[in-house]
A protein has these predicted regions:
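Short low-complexity, flexible loop/linker segments enriched in glycine and/or proline
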Residues: 44-46, 131-132
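Proline-glycine-enriched beta-turn/loop adjacent to the NAD(P) cofactor-binding site
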Residues: 11, 34, 47
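Conserved redox-cofactor binding core of oxidoreductases
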Residues: 91-96, 124-144
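Dinucleotide-binding Rossmann-like beta1-alpha1 core, especially the glycine-rich loop
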Residues: 46-126
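Proline-centered flexible-loop/turn and helix-kink motifs
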Residues: 24-26, 76, 128
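N-terminal Rossmann-like FAD-binding beta1-loop-alpha1 element of flavoenzymes
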Residues: 3-30
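Glycine-rich FAD pyrophosphate-binding loop
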Residues: 22-44
Length: 144
């Protein structure tokens, strides 16, 4: 049989590429070494969907945000659970506080709205089992 596209690997990336290309009039073959798709790295991945605040690179941040929306839409379409659980980053020294503020300001400049700096008390209220001396926290609501 003739194929227009051959995809090697049936992990999350390979399957996503196959899905997107299936929207066009193409004959697609996906080859996976395991007995089923998503059995290798995709099976044990942390499954965190970031909101674009992690990076200082504007382009990567934009792609992360677009990816978030695509993943959320795909989950709804295929009835896959998708839950925004948020991400808490903490600083225990002055340099860490500086980095959190830098990340916060960078995220705000890129239009990421659901992100906030937290005081030590707010961090402990959110995560009362934290076992380090926290100076400040950064909370991103849109991380899933």
């Amino acid at each position: 049989m003739d194929y227009d596209v051959l995809i090697l690997g049936g992990g999350i990336v390979g399957c996503t590429v196959a899905y997107e290309l299936s929207k066009y009039n193409l004959n697609i073959a996906l080859i996976e070494k395991a007995s089923d798709i998503a059995e290798d790295i995709s099976l044990i991945n942390t499954s965190v969907v970031y909101d674009g605040s992690e990076t200082t690179n504007k382009t990567i941040s934009e792609y992360e945000r677009k990816g978030c929306k695509l993943i959320e839409e795909a989950c709804k379409k295929f009835n896959v659970p998708y839950k925004k659980v948020g991400a808490l980053r903490v600083a225990s020294d002055d340099y860490g506080v500086f980095k959190l503020k830098e990340m916060f300001n960078s995220a705000k400049e890129r239009g990421i709205e659901k992100i906030s700096l937290l005081s030590k008390e707010e961090v402990i209220e959110l995560e009362n089992n934290i076992n380090i001396d926290v100076k400040q926290g950064l909370y991103s609501e849109d991380v899933a």
